[in-house]
Amino acid sequence: MQKYEIILYWSDEDRVFVAEVPELPGCMAHGATQEATLKSVNEAIRLWIHTAEEFGDPVPEPKGRRLMLA
């Protein structure tokens, strides 16, 4: 798995954890727990990359995995 930065935070409005991947526009996931959200966002990263490659779009190189809790 590529090592992309993940920003994980709690959304009071939606009452779920949200994970965003800034290096992959639009790549995000949510879940009831931090663990479930991280599992979902890793799948979202895999699917984002697969879709980009399928359409011939560039896939950004990861800057290094870092988990930020906000």
Show where each model-derived region lies:
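A short, exposed loop/beta-hairpin motif centered on an aromatic-Gly-Thr core
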Residues: 25-36
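Short aromatic-glycine-(Arg/Gly/Cys) micro-motifs in beta-strand/loop hairpins
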Residues: 9-24
